[in-house]
Amino acid sequence: MLFISATNTNAGKTTCARLLAQYCNACGVKTILLKPIETGVNDAINHSSDAHLFLQDNRLLDRSLTLKDISFYRYHKVSAPLIAQQEEDPNAPIDTDNLTQRLHNFTKTYDLVIVEGAGGLCVPITLEENMLDFALKLKAKMLLISHDNLGLINDCLLNDFLLKSHQLDYKIAINLKGNNTAFHSISLPYIELFNTRSNNPIVIFQQSLKVLMSFALK
């Protein structure tokens, strides 16, 4: 199981998750995408949420899948899951134990289960648990996606520091957009220096699909 988080919201988790799953499936690795918790959605009028996009991809493998099969807590409010849950469904806190069981059931059918979190590692799910706690409970490997803008060095190093302090395998990958020419002169020089001293180098996502698939499966 691979848990995908990010340095922050809008870093490109969903895009990267879909690209990695498509690559894995093309390589013969049967891969499903799950979005157990999603906020800022209105399923009655908007069918382009992260989970809807995942469902579209997943149905290439199993036409019987529905949104409820891959996304279990869905809220209208654009906020951390804890805040949305307390406002919209205060008597039904998110049960990560139940989620863990449901997500692990997919490992019986699929070679690789990709779980996308909401926001970054410290986003609260309950008063006691955040996204990193959830990934640890799942015993999943972690793929952390970084944006490619100015400030990514600080964001990557902070997340690397946090992840190193926990017992889980992780990789950090930069979601490099094709039109970002500034990255190569502003941020890449430090990333290359960092990688010479680190036993867990930061990679560029688009250049590392094979590496990331191998990491997820090993």
Swiss-Prot record:
Binding site for ATP: 9-15, 50, 116-119, 175-177
Cofactor annotation: Mg(2+)
Residues the record lists as binding substrate: T39, G151, L152, I153, N154
Keyword Acetylation: no
Cofactor note (record): Binds 1 Mg(2+) per subunit, in some structures a second Mg(2+) is also seen.
GO cellular component: cytosol
Domain of life: Bacteria
HAMAP family tied to this protein: BioD
Protein name per UniProt: ATP-dependent dethiobiotin synthetase BioD
Native organism taxonomy: Bacteria, Pseudomonadati, Campylobacterota, Epsilonproteobacteria, Campylobacterales
